[in-house]
Amino acid sequence: MSDVLPARFLTPVDLAELLGVPVETVYQWRRKRTGPRGFRVGRHLRYDPQDVRAWIEQQMTVGIA
């Protein structure tokens, strides 16, 4: 997983490309508070790769249970 995620903060477009989902899905997750935790830098939405990794691992655990 660490090989795939960059060492910089991700944009919604980066996250969508990484997960193979439309960008609108990333924004819907944000509105519904179901996706990875994001934060704002001024007007720009960013995602910490560590938070994305934790969210993916959580989704994998939920899918197994």
What are these model-predicted stretches?
Residues 1-28, 58:
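Polyanion-binding surface elements
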Residues 11-12, 21, 41, 45, ...:
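Hydrophobic aliphatic residue packing
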Residues 13, 36, 63-64:
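Serine/threonine-rich, low-complexity intrinsically disordered segments
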